[in-house]
Amino acid sequence: MAIKLNHTIVHSTDPDAAAHFFAGLFGLPAPKSFGPFLDVEVGNEVTLAFLSAGGMEVQVQHYAFLVSDQEFDEIFARVQKRKLKYWADPGMKQEGEINKHYGGRGVYFQDLSGHLLEIITRPYGAWGKW
């Protein structure tokens, strides 16, 4: 059996706002409440479970999403409409740029708790696969 990611917890300063921000930005269905979590289903049977950091400092994480060219255009348009800062690199040095790694496009931006979100149209290391 192949191992698949099923869900991960995304600690947030305001999980309700963070889950709705994420779902809206990515064009996904509204979050569903499940116990203390606000779940956003991202596809491929994977769920992001937004949870309050409980007053503790949120440890910033990186979440990368492989999207189609059309999805990239749609998500990136929402990033721009919301006037979010974006970068071509995870070090946030190339502001306002899009990377072109492996013949695709990629961009990084932050969510409401500071997590670094990334959308890419080609998986890294994808030469010869696309």
Roles of regions detected by a PLM:
Residues 7-9, 39, 62-64, 106-108:
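Short aromatic/hydrophobic contact patches that present stacked aromatics
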Residues 2, 9-48, 52-54:
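Core segments of cupin and vicinal oxygen chelate
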Residues 29-34, 91, 121-124:
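Conserved catalytic-core motifs of GNAT/GCN5-like acyltransferases
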Residues 2-4, 56-60, 100-101:
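Short glycine-enriched loop/turn motifs at secondary-structure junctions
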Residues 65-112, 116, 124-130:
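Vicinal oxygen chelate
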Residues 44-47, 56-57, 68-73:
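Short, charged/polar surface micro-motifs in flexible loops or helix N-caps
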Residues 48-51, 108, 117-120:
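Conserved beta-strand in the GNAT
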Residues 1-16, 63, 122-130:
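N-terminal beta-strand motif that seeds the catalytic metal site of vicinal oxygen chelate
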